[in-house]
């Protein structure tokens, strides 16, 4: 009798452990592909199209300068190796500073630093800027000492990025078709951040910060003046960390 009861308890325990292990594996996979916040929501069943919430956040939009030229000159495997090294620098910096990487689009990266994840709005802005500066530093180190798989690429050139940081309200949730959803952020603030990033090359800066983000920061910044953005009614003031 007692042995049979013990066997029964062991089966129940194994079943419970198995379910927990499956959930953990599923959580790890979702976190890897969607990010921690989005992955957690999907694991909890938030998979209805349109489900989500408005959030205030510092929005990060970045891309790789010269991507079109590189993609035309390099083979597919070489381009993938280069992008992986590049995204390792940028996404790693975002995650190091408690940001949420939402998606990679070609050479582009979309990330957020939700205010709710930080003690203050200032802390979120400081984290986003620290991540941007770390990403640029890591790219510099990559260019100076490329790993063997990058150094072996004949036609590669030093990697440069443009990063825009903007503050605004976005909708964080499921968008897409009934059979294919994407957990992302949308809204005017995302569009504005993308327009700002497009100015980084012409302004000669790797990091551009909008007035909305700069207002949270207590550190010297270069004032780059006001700039018109396509699709945005009023010109927007832009700032950047001082050049070294």
Predicted regions: what they are:
Residues 151-154, 175-187:
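Short, surface-exposed loop/helix-turn segments at secondary-structure junctions
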